[in-house]
Amino acid sequence: LATCPFFYVAAQYANHDMLVAGLITAAILALAIAVERPPQVQLGWLLAGSLACALATLAKGLIGFVLPVLVIVPWLLAQGRWRQLVKLLHPLGVLVFLLVAAPWFVVTQMSYPAFFDYFFVEQHFRRFALSSFNNVAPFWFFIVLLPALTLPWSVWLPRALKYAWSTRDARIALYGWWVIAIVGFFSFPSSKITGYVLPAAAPWCALLTLLIARGNTRLWQWVMGAAALVCVLIVAVIAWQAPKSNRAAALVLAARIAPADSVVMVDEYFYDLPFYARLNRPVIIASDWADPALPTRDNWRKELFDATRFAPALGREVLRPLNALDSLLCGTGAVWFVVVPKQAQRVAGLAGITRVFSNANTELWRAPAHACP
């Protein structure tokens, strides 16, 4: 796993995919260890698995416990170990899960009465069933993607499959079913993102490792060295290309902004700018909020648009139409527009505006306030 490109490509994204994949992996392994001495269930490992399921649920919703259940339950039933399955429902395990996961959901629902419908119904069931949401890909997308992202080790896949099919080792069966369950689960929805299949990375690599370790030692050691070098190069390229920091623009803004001034981000959200500029109130985001395609794209616009359901007054204040930028100049303070260079023409014609800062990633423009009729 540590020498697979998949691991490093996925790690560059600032989202919860790696976190929930790690927690789901920890949950499945803990539950598998809990039942490794049939017919007993080791309570300590069961509680660890319950805790990991709860944390995974907090990280990214119901898949935090649905996927571990989808892996462990059929695996035990296929071996006729239903007594252990019943013991996994130990009251202490259920209690740990509820104590960790439930309070946040309860408090959020009490604060925002529409939360349960949005989070559980829309973000799970409706989104799972939609055929046109976000990155639409064919059913076989992950079946092709997983071997591609785990090269060079996936070259051993045919032999690994043959070995897994011929053995009756429960551990091999667990890893095999684990991969099938995760890949199958995320293959049914039409929306597919690379990070979805991360919970299958560990068992996939474990299957390949068990076979490779039985083969030519010199060969796999040479491949490991080459793979490690490739991964280092991937990290180097990402580190060289990826930085798109807005820190320089933010420092200029922080030095010159007045208390009465406002900040407007134009058709883009500059995540790090409020942090570096130490802004203490919400920025205004100008975009096409009436776009009918907005609900079908999983991006920053949809996140902010969805948030207006729970804070409509604040939404009306900070989410402004892109075609009414001049109206934002009405007030007592100056207005600072933050744009990507290719969008600079949207603000260049505003009354009295001047460009204060520019680099390859960001431009900062200042327009004085004026009285409006």
List the predicted regions and their residue ranges:
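Signature aromatic-anchored transmembrane alpha helix within multi-pass, membrane-resident enzymes
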Residues: I212-V235
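Hydrophobic alpha-helical transmembrane segments in integral membrane proteins
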Residues: G195, V232-A255
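Luminal/periplasmic acceptor-recognition loop/helix of membrane-associated glycosyltransferases
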Residues: S245-E268, L279-P373
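Short glycine/proline- and acidic residue-enriched helix-loop micro-motifs
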Residues: A129-L130, F142, L233-A236, D306-F310
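Active-site phosphate/pyrophosphate- and oxyanion-stabilizing loops and adjacent acidic/basic residues
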Residues: C53, L251, Y271
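Short, flexible loop segments at the rims of nucleotide/cofactor-binding pockets, characterized by
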Residues: V41, S132, I238-P243, P312-V318
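Membrane-integral, polyisoprenol-dependent glycosyltransferases
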Residues: L1-R218, L279, A360
